[in-house]
A protein has these predicted regions:
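Glycine-rich, often proline-containing surface loops adjacent to acidic residues and nearby aromatics
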Residues: 1, 87-92, 160-166
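Hydrophobic, proline/glycine-rich low-complexity stretches
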Residues: 1-2, 194
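Gly/Pro-rich turn-and-neighbor structural signature
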Residues: 3, 7-53
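A generic structural motif
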Residues: 5, 88, 98-103, 168-174, ...
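Long, solvent-exposed, polar/charged low-complexity segments
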Residues: 8, 13-24, 111-112, 116, ...
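Aromatic- and glycine-enriched beta-alpha-beta binding-site module
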Residues: 44-113
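A contiguous pocket-lining binding segment that forms or flanks enzyme active sites
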Residues: 93-143
Length: 206
């Protein structure tokens, strides 16, 4: 890795993340205190169980959350995630990706208890136009145990993530459009963020 060049690119990416947090705060006040440095993912790859032993990633990525908790296991809730790779591809998504079992169960229960509200989110015009449907990666073949197989949202109950995702070509000749484009894309998914934040976790001691 060319360390001097990486350091320059990292500082440029940090500036993007910092500016983006400011733009997101216009419609989502909860991310105002997000630390941009903590939002950025490390360049080092975990190669312990990987066949690809290259030590460094070929992309810059960040996850913006209210509590600086990017990972589902840390209980961070909805994340505004984006990455830029070396080929000029911009990918971004919003929601909860592979949340831990207790959180996943709570989301599924909320779908059942707030079927109308969830349906409204899934029909949101901005969400559908930008992202389409929820990511169905690792979707269950059968309904999860304890849930009605005839429920109107049974296909969504099978999901393991409640996350929307898209990718576009980076406007390399219009770098000043990056943050506005991301902010617009993230705002289009704010209905999903709001709904997920309404999911209540039960007290484990109950």
């Amino acid at each position: 890795m060319n360390k001097p060049r990486y350091d320059i690119l990292r500082e440029e990416f940090l500036a993007v993340v910092t500016e983006l947090i400011g733009e997101l705060t216009r419609f989502d006040k909860q991310v105002a205190a997000c630390n941009p440095k903590k939002a950025m993912f490390r360049i080092n790859r975990d190669i312990r169980f990987a066949t690809d032993k290259r030590p460094y990633k070929t992309r810059f990525s960040a996850g913006i959350t209210p509590k600086d908790l990017r990972r589902p296991s840390a209980g961070g809730g909805s994340t505004y995630y984006f990455q830029i790779d070396g080929s000029g591809k911009l990918q971004f998504g919003v929601g909860e990706y592979l949340p831990p079992a207790p959180r996943l169960k709570a989301i599924r229960e909320h779908i059942v208890n707030d079927a109308t509200g969830f349906a409204k989110v899934m029909k949101n015009k901005q969400l559908r136009a930008t992202y389409g449907d929820l990511l169905d990666e690792d979707k269950l073949q059968r309904p999860p145990k304890g849930f009605d197989p005839q429920h109107v949202h049974v296909e969504y109950l099978k999901l393991k993530s409640f996350f929307v995702w898209t990718d576009i070509d980076l406007k390399v000749n219009q770098p000043d459009q990056l943050v506005p484009d991301l902010a617009r894309g993230f705002k289009d998914a704010f209905a999903l963020v709001t709904w997920l934040r309404s999911v209540e976790m039960s007290n484990p001691e109950e």
